Amino acid sequence: MSAYTVSRLALDAGVSVHIVRDYLLRGLLRPVACTTGGYGLFDDTALQRLRFVRAAFEAGIGLDALARLCRALDAADGDGASAQLAVLRQLVERRREALASLEMQLAAMPTEPAQHAESLP
């Protein structure tokens, strides 16, 4: 097992230490052990979760929804985790639809400057 400090976890996930600490406060991450000095230690599973949470957040999934999923996973609540995963899948599908609509709108946008001023008296 690899043991990560907050700073090493942040570095390996490509995020700031502040993000890791924020996720800890929100319950998105939990240390698996503590040093004698009281510092949290994390394992590879925590690194995977951090990468997942960050990717989901970057994709537009809110931290509250992600926290509900993480709480269900941490509580070994299979039904709760399944329900939260279903919610996340719905959010992802809505994002896909919104992005597809935006893509169509972008494709329809004119690339030349508008000639409105010339037609005014």
UniProtKB/Swiss-Prot annotation:
Molecular function terms from GO: DNA binding; DNA-binding transcription factor activity
SMART domains on file: HTH_MERR
Biological processes per GO annotation: negative regulation of DNA-templated transcription; response to mercury ion
Record-annotated HTH merR-type domain positions: 3-72
Domain of life: Bacteria
Keywords: DNA-binding, Mercuric resistance, Plasmid, Transcription, Transcription regulation
Any Pfam family matching the protein: MerR_1
InterPro entries in the cross-refs: DNA-bd_dom_put_sf, MerD, MerR-type_HTH_dom, MerR_fam
DNA-binding region, residues: 6-25
PANTHER family per the UniProt record, alphabetical: HTH MERR-TYPE DOMAIN-CONTAINING PROTEIN, REDOX-CYCLING DRUG-SENSING TRANSCRIPTIONAL ACTIVATOR SOXR
This protein's name: HTH-type transcriptional regulator MerD
Organism ancestry: Bacteria, Pseudomonadati, Pseudomonadota, Gammaproteobacteria, Moraxellales
Gene from which the chain derives: merD
